[in-house]
């Protein structure tokens, strides 16, 4: 059995895990197109309430009874095969589609699909691009992996041919997409619970590039050797950017006291515009250049680019300011890969704080084990590290790796590091060791943010 989104408007679609960031956006697009939508989630949330208001039938908890008069069931990689709704869908011979395949179906209904790929920076860059597209009145449909203030959440349903989405490489999910413009920000070893090695990852990105039609475009980071290697297979138009290389470059870069950059953008030797960003870090200078490349492709004028990028203050959980208490600043960041952590700490170091205390929660046993040596070396820019237990996410603890082992190695490397085993223990350390003018930085993709929230409250 198959499902064609453009023809099967009478089909009723059910989402398992509808409250998730990615699934909720897909559900909203369908509701706007006139589909009957239902979905289940483990708990009620702002997202499920918003979807209910828009006409979705929401079930809290998973049960075979939730599949009432349903034709298509959509699920994510996080849903186990013994989920009662998956079992019921198979028993009833319903159409079962994973999230990536279903998103690909939605993309078929748009001409100008923009897919933002890369190991790091997808959410921030997708958000930047969304700001520029909205500033240019393109009326895009947007699916982003974090909450974005300008669209009041993680999705926006537009009424144009423009569709902007993140493209995650995990389990090769982005190979189900239909991009007209692909963007590759960077390529590093990650998701090694699925990929064999970096060559396997590069081969998958090459397949992504081959998806783009001959009249389409691939935008790539010319400062990243692995990206440039991948772009060699392109049969479509190629546009590159970088701080030091590429068709589009940033020059005359200066940072203010908040770590945010002002710079000039050149295409070859022609100055296109000057930009002042409202998000910190050199990595965001690079990310913003990919948005300029896209603007060049879609003939967006300089005023809209400047307006869009200068108005972007960051996506939630991406170097997000959480508050200040006793003149101690609290910032939360989603970084969970050594490259991301180094970029986050480098950004923090450009700000004028007396001391940087980083509370880090490793994310998944596989990532911690496979990138162990990189994790040991990525905290050099913090003054003190508070290391929490590994956040398991979708994995089981096989007893092969733990945070105490990582902490020992980090201490041997010369970084002041303290292991803690609960949010409360982390809070005790923070309360005892931070003083006026310091920065508390919570880092990770799990629930480490609670430490900063406990401190502020």
From Swiss-Prot:
The gene is murC. Gene3D superfamilies: Mur ligase, C-terminal domain, Mur-like, catalytic domain, NAD(P)-binding Rossmann-like Domain. Keywords: ATP-binding, Cell cycle, Cell division, Cell shape, Cell wall biogenesis/degradation, Cytoplasm, Ligase, Nucleotide-binding, Peptidoglycan synthesis. The lineage of its organism: Bacteria, Bacillati, Bacillota, Clostridia, Eubacteriales. One of its GO terms (cellular component) is cytoplasm. Its EC number is 6.3.2.8. Belongs to the MurCDEF family. It catalyses: UDP-N-acetyl-alpha-D-muramate + L-alanine + ATP = UDP-N-acetyl-alpha-D-muramoyl-L-alanine + ADP + phosphate + H(+). ATP binds at residues 118-124. PANTHER family: UDP-N-ACETYLMURAMATE--L-ALANINE LIGASE, UDP-N-ACETYLMURAMATE--L-ALANINE LIGASE-RELATED. HAMAP family: MurC. This is UDP-N-acetylmuramate--L-alanine ligase. Pfam families: Mur_ligase (PF01225), Mur_ligase_C (PF02875), Mur_ligase_M (PF08245). The keyword Chaperone does not apply. Pathway: Cell wall biogenesis; peptidoglycan biosynthesis. Cell wall formation.
């Amino acid at each position: 059995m198959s499902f064609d989104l453009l023809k099967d408007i009478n089909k009723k679609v059910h989402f398992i895990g509808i409250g998730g960031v990615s699934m909720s956006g897909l559900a909203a697009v369908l509701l706007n197109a006139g589909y009957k939508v239902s979905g289940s989630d483990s708990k009620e949330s702002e997202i499920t309430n918003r979807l209910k208001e828009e006409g979705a039938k929401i079930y809290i908890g998973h049960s075979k009874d939730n599949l009432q008069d349903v034709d298509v069931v959509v699920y994510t990689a996080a849903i186990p095969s013994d989920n009662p709704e998956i079992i019921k869908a198979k028993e009833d011979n319903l159409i079962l589609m994973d999230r990536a395949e279903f998103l690909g179906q939605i993309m078929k209904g748009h001409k100008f699909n923009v897919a933002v790929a890369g190991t790091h920076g997808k959410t921030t860059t997708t958000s930047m691009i969304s700001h520029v597209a909205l500033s240019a009145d393109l009326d895009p449909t947007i699916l982003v992996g974090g909450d974005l203030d300008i669209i009041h959440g993680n999705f926006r349903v537009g009424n144009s041919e423009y569709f902007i989405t993140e493209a995650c490489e995990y389990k090769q999910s982005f190979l189900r997409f239909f991009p007209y413009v692909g963007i590759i920000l960077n390529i590093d070893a990650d998701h090694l619970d699925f990929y064999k090695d970096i060559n396997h990852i590069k081969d998958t990105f090459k397949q992504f590039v081959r998806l783009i039609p001959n009249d389409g475009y691939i935008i790539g980071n010319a400062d990243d050797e692995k990206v440039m290697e991948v772009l060699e297979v392109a049969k479509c138009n190629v546009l590159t950017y970088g701080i030091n290389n590429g068709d589009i470059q940033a020059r005359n870069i200066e940072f203010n006291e908040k770590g945010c950059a002002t710079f000039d953008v050149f295409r070859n030797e022609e100055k296109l515009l000057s930009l002042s960003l409202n998000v910190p870090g050199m990595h965001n200078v690079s990310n913003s250049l990919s948005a300029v490349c896209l603007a060049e492709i879609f003939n967006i004028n300089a005023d809209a680019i400047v307006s869009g990028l200068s108005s972007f203050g960051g996506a939630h959980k991406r170097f997000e300011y959480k508050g200040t208490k006793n003149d101690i600043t609290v910032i939360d960041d989603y970084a969970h890969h050594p490259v991301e952590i180094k970029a986050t700490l480098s950004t923090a170091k450009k700000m004028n704080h007396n001391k940087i205390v980083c509370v880090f929660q490793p994310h998944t046993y596989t990532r911690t084990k496979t990138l162990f040596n990189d994790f040991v070396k990525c905290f050099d820019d913090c003054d003190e590290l508070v290391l929490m237990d590994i956040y398991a996410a979708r994995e089981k603890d096989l007893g092969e790796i733990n945070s105490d082992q990582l902490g020992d190695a980090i201490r041997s490397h010369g970084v002041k590091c303290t292991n803690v085993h609960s949010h409360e223990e982390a809070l005790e350390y923070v309360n005892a060791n931070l003083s006026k003018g310091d920065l508390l930085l919570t880092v990770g993709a799990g629930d480490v943010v609670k430490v900063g929230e406990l401190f502020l409250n």
